[in-house]
């Protein structure tokens, strides 16, 4: 009888081909945050996913905590858009408000939730691109400082991580 042990030959091979275990404690749930009050709107392209106004975030936070989800990644949907995506880096923007709300909500319950903020300008710009446009192209040198301003605004609000998705 021949037993093939080549995938168990070394620690590196064993780690590489070991079973992967996924549980809620390793997952991050996306949350889309909109301006306004008392809003919970379905995201048509993502069944079971909703856009929440800040005042309704407690509902989804409770669900995440009950399921044992490790954290959330916040995506902002601004009320107004402009050419430079200024809503992304406003300290009173929808994402910084959501970060502060979630941190306070969890602290009041003696719980923790990892809060990650998406750092991208495309949702905040009137043209839908992830940066400043010059002659129809994204100008990286002009855009990077705006991404940095957004990341700093989220950090000031209390985000545990920022995640550039541009």
Map each language-model feature to its residues.
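Short amphipathic alpha-helices and their capping/turn segments at secondary-structure boundaries
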Residues: 12-22, 54, 58-68, 96-111
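N-terminal small/glycine-rich loop or linker at the start of catalytic domains
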Residues: 22-49, 113-138
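Short, acidic/polar
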Residues: 54-62, 142-152
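Alpha-helix-loop-beta-strand connector modules within alpha/beta enzyme cores
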Residues: 82-119
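Acidic, His- and aromatic-enriched active-site or binding-groove loops in soluble protein domains
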Residues: 95-100, 136-148
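Glycine-rich, proline-tolerant flexible connector loops at the mouths of alpha/beta enzymes
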Residues: 40-52, 67-95, 161-166
């Amino acid at each position: 009888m021949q037993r093939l042990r080549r995938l168990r030959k070394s620690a590196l091979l064993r780690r590489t081909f070991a079973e992967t275990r996924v549980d809620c404690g390793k997952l991050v749930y996306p949350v889309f945050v909109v301006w306004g009050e008392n809003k919970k709107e379905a995201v048509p392209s993502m069944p079971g996913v909703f856009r929440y106004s800040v005042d309704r975030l407690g509902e989804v936070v409770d669900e995440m905590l009950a399921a044992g989800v490790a954290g959330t990644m916040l995506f902002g949907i601004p009320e107004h858009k402009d050419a430079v995506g200024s809503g992304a880096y406003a300290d009173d923007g929808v994402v910084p408000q959501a970060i502060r709300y979630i941190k306070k909500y969890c602290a009041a319950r003696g719980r923790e939730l990892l809060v990650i903020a998406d750092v991208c300008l495309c949702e905040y710009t009137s043209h839908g691109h992830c940066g400043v446009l010059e002659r129809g192209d994204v100008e990286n040198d002009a855009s990077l400082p705006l991404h940095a301003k957004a990341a700093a605004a989220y950090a000031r609000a209390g985000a545990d991580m920022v995640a550039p998705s541009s």
